[in-house]
A protein has these predicted regions:
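Conserved small/polar residues in nucleotide/adenosyl-binding loops
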Residues: 1-5, 240-246
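Periplasmic POTRA and POTRA-like interaction domains that precede
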Residues: 4-47, 72-127, 153-188, 228
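Amphipathic, non-transmembrane alpha-helical segments in extracytoplasmic/periplasmic proteins
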Residues: 48-67, 129-146
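Extended beta-sheet lipid-handling architectures
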Residues: 51, 67-69, 191, 220
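Short beta-strand elements
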Residues: 66-75, 144-152
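Gram-negative/organellar outer-membrane beta-barrel architecture
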Residues: 107, 123-242
Length: 250
């Protein structure tokens, strides 16, 4: 068996000496300059270019430039072991959201989903607001999965539709209890539905019964009781019936 030792040389390291923007950058300098400054005088790598491309693309997407193009171009100085980075920016047209669409909500009503939106129809399309909307749908607890995609509107170059696809899951819970004490057998039953009839409201029913006591309770919770999003919970029906045991005379 022959064993060979190999020496691998990664070559010299290059330092980023300058970073500049080429093309049309519609974002404020106060937002861009700190990003550029953090890249100077650090070791150059291709991953560094990719990271900055993604940051600029995300920032542009949050301001409505859904189809922005960002390309990093290195200018390498072999003698000085330095690299000047240029980022060529083509923001494209600012993009509007034409429609927000929902698919897969067979039970949950559209308005329950729509009130969670942070991206609005007719407004600039914002990647950040679209993602916030997706997360808020997930947090409702009505869906196994929530996915979103942006679809260019045919015949236009500045409009998109935002399409949310949801997979609903069971939102009801049934429970019960059975016990025995000095007062005899005790039976309990409870039903909780977190998305009653697809309205997003929660309804609960609880029944507890023994030989001497009966307790009935109905609860209701509306997370959007007002148009401003104020919630309200209450128990419109609560009934207790108590029967005292008879003490036999000696």
């Amino acid at each position: 068996m022959c064993i060979r030792d190999s020496i691998i040389s990664e070559g010299p390291q290059y330092t980023i000496s300058d970073v500049k923007i080429v093309g049309d950058m519609p974002l404020n300098e106060e937002l861009i300059d700190p990003i550029i400054e953090t890249q100077k005088d650090i070791t150059y790598s291709q991953a560094q270019i990719t990271q900055i491309e993604e940051i600029f693309t995300s920032l542009l997407g949050n301001e409505g430039y859904a189809f922005a193009s960002v390309k990093g171009q290195p200018d390498i100085d072999e003698e000085m072991l330095e690299v000047d980075l240029s980022f060529v920016i083509d923001p494209g047209k600012r993009t509007y959201t034409r429609k927000i669409l929902f698919e897969g909500n067979e039970i949950t009503q559209d308005d329950v989903l729509r009130r969670e939106m942070r991206q609005f129809e007719g407004a600039w399309a914002s990647d950040d607001k679209i993602e916030q909307s997706r997360v808020r749908l997930e947090r409702l607890g009505f869906f196994k999965e929530v996915n979103v995609e942006t679809v260019p509107v045919p015949g236009t170059d500045d409009q998109i539709d935002v399409k949310f696809r949801v997979e609903e899951e069971t939102t009801g819970n049934v429970g019960g209890n059975l016990g025995y004490s000095d007062f005899g057998l005790m039976i309990g039953f409870n039903l909780q539905e977190r998305n009653f009839l697809g309205t997003g409201n929660s309804v609960g029913i609880a029944i507890n019964k023994s030989i001497y006591q009966e307790v009935y309770n109905l609860s209701f919770y509306d997370p959007y009781f007002t148009i401003d999003g104020a919630s309200r919970g209450y128990s419109p029906v609560s009934y207790t019936h108590l029967t005292l045991p008879t003490i036999a005379k000696v």
